[in-house]
Amino acid sequence: MNAFLLQLAIYLVVLLVLAKPLGAYMTGVFGDKPSRAHWLGPVERLFYRVAGVNPQAEMGWKHYALAVIVVNVLGALAVYALQRAQQWLPLNPQGFGAVTPDSSFNTAVSFVTNTNWQGYSGESTMSYLTQMLGLAVQNFLSAATGIAVVIALIRGFARHSANTIGNFWVDFTRSTVYVLLPLSIIVSVFFVSQGVIQNFDGYKEVTTVTATTYDNPKMDASGQPIKDAQGNPVTEKATTQTQTLPMGPIASQEAIKMIGTNGGGPFNANSAHPYENPNALTNFVQMLAIFIIPAALCFTFGGMVGDGRQGWAVLAAMTVLFVVLAVFLAWAELHPNPMLANLGIDEAVGNMEGKETRFGIVASSLFATITTAASCGAVNAMHDSLTALGGFVPMFLMQLGEVVFGGVGSGLYGMLVYAILAVFIAGLMIGRTPEYLGKKIEVFEMKMTSIAILVTPLLVLVGTAVAVVVTQGKAGIFNPGTHGFSEVLYAFSSAANNNGSAFAGLSANTPFYNLALGICMWLGRFWIIVPVLAMAGTFAAKKRLPVTAGTLPTHGPLFVVLLIGSVLLVGALTYIPALALGPIAEHLAR
């Protein structure tokens, strides 16, 4: 545990050192005045001329929301078409055929919504062109969408008596040109220097030193495993002495996969694969890349509203929640797994099942907490192999609404929604009209807040309930009992909250799960973005109220505690009954 606490402390210090200047830089990028941060001005203006965009024309919240939805719908259609036509397109050295319609739909929605749920195996499904032109491009655009939306909300707080919240196309372009692309280039070059591959070669067939005998599951005509009368998978012995090594442009996609809190990797093993994450140093940089923009945006928030203490308060609430849950996950994994107690496995160091020896329990536990605190979903260990209490942590982090740092942009606007709720609750307790950053919280704002908070629990709980009842949903569950329920609950929690990680024991690449999870991903993204933009518009139109003796300070320890309490209260009341049927019951049964 001491090793974990040391690595956690080093991680947080380095993150803070990097995030603060990046936050100040983004304040200049998205500010209303000309800034030295606009160092790529000629490139930016060229994009506007080509696209026919007037960067001086600002938008009301409805126009802004329409632009967000239109660009993402077009993106989803483009990714879908690319997958369906990839067998006729270049940069497909393995000759992969068209992706099935249901999987194409799921993948298109997944990458457009910044979820990156992957029901397929990337190295055996997607061509290089599909990975680069479809998935990697959406890694940039979905992250840029999240940043644009949170910047619009911040402008709503910063402005007063205004009818506009900015220009989506300007925010979208600046997010990509000034933030995402430069960071991705730096990180990509670093990854290449550490051994992450970057090429367009065909896959390599190599001969192994010794032959390998393994149990190969038998598949039916639809590609699903055949089960015996007891429900166990039917296998047959197979032997091989060759191995296929996948190639591809990995480093370039790996960088934006992390920086944009996307999470979907070119390989099925994701960041556990040595071609994506070869050593402890790349692992540490990947963890930094996940949190760097969400943390920096807290400083951008403080800078744009003219009070840096506001950003510190939000960052403090996020950090407290993160540290507590990270320590709990590490504690659970540093203990032996009761399921393996009777198998004669040496668990003196803790639960090593599903973890890479080059990372160990400490780095794997920290990575698992970071990737689910942010809406990233990349993994360097298999979450399905975590202990019951260990698996509880990433699931609960997602169910909190991905607000503990959260996704790029989405984490901060999600936490600001909770800040509005916290101020409203405080106002009720002291009998004053609630206000936040000088803006009065009224009926419309609370309606939008309620919608934004309640959408994902509705999708998660209803989706899980349907999946464990209907035949198509139950067919994908291979682990009976509480763990099987946990796998389904995790899948819908991940999809609706746009995380993308999985308890991979669930067979989710089926028409039922592809459609159900795809719908959850889309609604979980845009059913929150629209209310957030609506609040941005109403806040911008309001007058700024002067600070009085009765105004609740929203920059001190009391507000931090109130904000944390609001997040936990909603999460606990909503999900504890479902969690009691899954990981909690699984732990008690052992």
UniProtKB/Swiss-Prot annotation:
Gene Ontology molecular-function annotations: P-type potassium transmembrane transporter activity; potassium ion binding
Keywords, ordered alphabetically: Cell inner membrane, Cell membrane, Ion transport, Membrane, Potassium, Potassium transport, Transmembrane, Transmembrane helix, Transport
Subcellular location(s) of the protein: Cell inner membrane
A Pfam short name: KdpA
Main location: membrane
Cellular component terms per the entry's GO annotation: plasma membrane
Tagged with keyword Membrane: yes
The protein's name: Potassium-transporting ATPase potassium-binding subunit
The species this protein was found in: Ralstonia pickettii (strain 12J)
Gene that encodes the chain: kdpA
